[in-house]
A protein has these predicted regions:
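Conserved glycine-rich Rossmann-like NAD(P)H-binding loop of the short-chain dehydrogenase/reductase
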Residues: 26-41
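Structural signature of the Rossmann-like NAD(P)-dependent dehydrogenase/reductase core
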Residues: 8-9, 78-79, 123-129, 169-174
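A short, exposed helix-loop element centered on a Lys and neighboring polar residues
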Residues: 111-112, 157
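C-terminal helical subdomain
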Residues: 172-175, 180, 184-222
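Catalytic loop of short-chain dehydrogenase/reductase
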Residues: 82, 87-99, 120-164
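Rossmann-fold cofactor-recognition segment
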Residues: 45-59
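N-terminal Rossmann NAD(P)H-binding glycine-rich loop of SDR-like oxidoreductase domains
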Residues: 12-22
């Protein structure tokens, strides 16, 4: 298998860390982007750790894209995200805006910054959530998070359409309910989620670009 250059945001813990680990095991080069590294990330020895990358900060995104000039990226995985639980009583405008900036605008800024570095037939991966599905909403609440992930889904579909002439495919993947800091440790193990996500990434092509999949292979409604 040809060694690939893979960029992963939010790689210092949770799903991002496990994806980094599993891609390294496959023999790929992984560039681990994060706000602050972790002992777990250092332990698995990514190709390169790039700290200080905050998707809220356009300058930090621009700086890291400059540092990696000349490196052709085969897979860009937008994993960094935030969840702030809310309901009608606890809803705060600032929290809604923050989730939009991190979960929707952040990944779009990453794509814009790294577009010149994407290899021929590169893959863009967006870790979204089925909570961003309108048709699958059966429980309500989580207004800011749901809206931000729905916005991310819309952005990713537009990117799939805009970038298909360049041979770039776009994956929109729900990782499942995963036991991470974001979910309070509830859900499936990160190793299981990452394994399924990698299967979806490996099978991603222009024919299924822009579709919404669960990591287990189920196609999800918008």
């Amino acid at each position: 298998m040809v060694q690939r250059n893979i960029l992963i945001t939010g790689s210092n813990r949770g799903i991002g860390l496990e994806l980094t680990k599993q891609f390294l095991t496959k023999g790929d080069q992984v560039f681990a982007l994060c706000r602050k590294s972790s002992s777990d990330l250092v332990l698995i020895k990514p190709t390169r750790i790039l700290e200080g990358v905050d998707v809220l900060d356009s300058n930090s995104i621009r700086d890291v894209s400059t540092k990696l000039l000349g490196t052709k990226i085969d897979i860009l995985i937008n994993n960094a995200g935030i969840l702030i639980p809310d309901n009608l009583q606890s809803l705060e405008e600032e929290n809604v805006f923050t989730q939009f900036l991190v979960n929707a605008l952040g990944p779009l800024k990453m794509v814009k910054a790294f577009l010149p570095s994407l290899n021929t037939n590169a893959k863009l991966v967006f870790l979204t959530s089925r909570m961003g599905s309108v048709g699958d909403n059966n429980s309500g609440a989580y207004y800011g998070y749901r809206a931000s992930k729905a916005a991310l889904n819309a952005i990713a579909v537009s990117l799939a359409l805009d970038l298909s002439p360049k041979g770039i495919s776009v994956g929109i993947f729900h990782p499942g309910m995963v036991a991470t800091q974001m979910t309070g440790g509830q859900g499936i193990p990160t190793i299981e989620s990452a394994r399924g996500l990698i299967e979806r990434i490996e099978s991603l092509n222009l024919n299924n670009s822009g579709k919404f999949f669960h990591q287990n292979g189920e196609e999800l409604p918008w």
